[in-house]
């Protein structure tokens, strides 16, 4: 746990009460100090009192003083009944003999306790502990934090779990700033604190509550209180006629007390007692002022609301107070001994359960000022999550996320100033040792991208593409090909270099345009780029390239930036490029692309847009009915022998296509293909409205029932255009196939075979279906860009006459791409 010194702040009420001298002792009764040499006798007499007269311990301190005076008058030696916490801590465990004169033994336990503590510290602090790290994007500041936590856990004897536990287990915890699993969860700060102190710390202040935490705690505490109340009633009925001064009870029940005390004694050491006092202090600060107390005599004690029960046997209200008090005001050692085990087990739950729930607690002025003070002294961490997680340990009524939201939405306007820090985030002081205030915010750990950074990234990517394509250094113009190249470098060069490139014919770097080139680009590029431009991490630069630069266009942003600079205007960084376009229609929860939900909305869609003819309406309605009945299509029709043979005959699978960059073309080939495509309008200008829907060739071995939900061929083609125009990377062939299946109802094996026929050219994808539906032939013959089995055989034969026919049909660019498919064994 981070100490207040880390923040150089923290009001006194947020400081852990680790020193017994800091514990607030109620001033209702003066503490009586016993001589140090009679500590064992004091402890023994207290144990006798508590065992022989359980019902009488709730009498007020004034009655205890009167008892002591009466005992003095009767010359009866009685131990002190009220001790300070320090006396209770130092009192040794005593074995009490009978009143006939047996000696009192006082074993020394200081050495034993010290040995136990040494044994605990000697081993790794996280030994036998297992942790599962929450790797959600909002759980940590960066992936480096997760890796650091994993290394710390393993280095200190702990184990990192690969999968989230399904149920609560001993010594198994989840590490996360929030708890949405209802499993034992600790904050990342707990791991760091244990490793820093080289000991296993008490995790009660690091536990993260579940959403329904208050309800669970209250129910468990009420059950415990109810059971205590039943025992109390029985005790009261047995002793209702025996309530008298404590000295009489001790004298008449000494034998029973001796038997019980000799068998059950637990030493309360100083640290445990201090922690008890700390919890009592926290509970007193945050308990509701409306807490009900049955006796009304101890208004400053924390109470647990109990269910109604029969109190006919309770003749004395003070007797009923005993079991209702969560922490007794006089801190009686015997009571602490008897309830120590159960209290320690549920102490963290009690301390948090008695507080207001997190989603309802309001921030006080003191808490707001405390948060502002911490942020002012840690200005570079103001946008992180870990800072507010650490603050939550000093503001126990709120979680780290709620504190972060509080600062960002409300308190950031009141920040006004921060304290100066150096480049490492450490506070800077003046000559007098005072902190230096400033209104200039230092750059935070998480920074936004600037236009200069976007331009630098675009130029670097363009240079990398230039090197890969022509093997020429864009800065010096020298060739990168040498006789000393390793086989690995040669193989990599062959994958990226333009095979049709003639050395010396390449354009200069200023005239070169990336066009639609999207990759490939190795991770090493971003690693080296992040080392040269340390303002952002490697992953941040890579995401900036993938999600922003590719979407904007490399050439487009370079042109925009240079044009703005030429006009003496300040260019803007790339933004608003990651917002997903809104889908048409009313979204439904869950998988709203499923066929079953589309079928439920089918009737309303049909009313809005009528179908072209009655036949298509009947077919679509039948498909919708089939979908609503979990695809009640005969199994032999869905998985017939021909379909299975078709699937097994495919030599290429999704992984091969994914690894072969099916959508990526070298620059020269791409230009040739685009040139041919622009002269083939006759194959694309087919009016979809002239094609009846569903077409005769559309069978269930090629399409899912979802396909038949479309009202017309135009609707299907519009959806197809929407899917293939998405932002797909060269390695995302499998994602494209899955999206086609989910959005248009094209079976995965069918779309995979189409990609093979098209050599991965998505521009020809709509052409394939238009000609297939129009001519009722699959695949469509004599269509440029669609390779049939006969075309492939002609290409493999190397017959010059056949090659000339293929060039005339498909063009030279597609010929080169098809050859690459053969070379990579994708056909």
Curated annotation (Swiss-Prot):
Location(s) in or outside the cell: Nucleus; Chromosome, Telomere
Keywords on record: Activator, Chromosome, DNA-binding, Nucleus, Phosphoprotein, Repressor, Telomere, Transcription, Transcription regulation
Cited PROSITE patterns: BRCT, HTH_MYB
GO cellular component: chromosome, telomeric region; cytosol; nuclear chromosome; nucleus; protein-DNA complex; shelterin complex; transcription regulator complex
Positions bearing Phosphothreonine: 486
Species the sequence originates in: Saccharomyces cerevisiae (strain ATCC 204508 / S288c) (Baker's yeast)
Chain positions covered by the region annotation Disordered: 29-128, 221-268, 308-339, 567-613
The name this protein goes by in its record: DNA-binding protein RAP1
Family annotation (InterPro entries): BRCT_dom (IPR001357), BRCT_dom_sf (IPR036420), Homeodomain-like_sf (IPR009057), Myb_dom (IPR017930), Rap1_C (IPR021661), Rap1_C_sf (IPR038104), Rap1_DNA-bd (IPR015280), SANT/Myb (IPR001005)
Compositionally biased region (Low complexity): 227-237, 310-319
Comp. bias regions, Basic and acidic residues: 58-72, 238-247
Modified residues (Phosphoserine): 731
GO MF annotations, alphabetized: cis-regulatory region sequence-specific DNA binding; DNA binding, bending; DNA-binding transcription factor activity; DNA-binding transcription factor activity, RNA polymerase II-specific; double-stranded telomeric DNA binding; G-quadruplex DNA binding; histone binding; nucleosomal DNA binding
Pfam families, sorted: BRCT_2 (PF16589), Myb_DNA-binding (PF00249), Rap1-DNA-bind (PF09197), Rap1_C (PF11626)
Family, as annotated: Belongs to the RAP1 family.
DNA-binding region(s) from the entry: 388-411
Residue ranges constituting the HTH myb-type domain according to the UniProt record: 355-415
Role: Essential regulatory protein in yeast whose DNA-binding sites are found at three types of chromosomal elements: promoters, silencers, and telomeres. RAP1 is also involved in the regulation of telomere structure, where its binding sites are found within the terminal poly[C(1-3)A] sequences. The opposite regulatory functions of RAP1 are not intrinsic to its binding sites but, instead, result from interactions with different factors at promoters and silencers. RAP1 mediates repression of the HM loci and telomeres by recruiting the SIR complex.
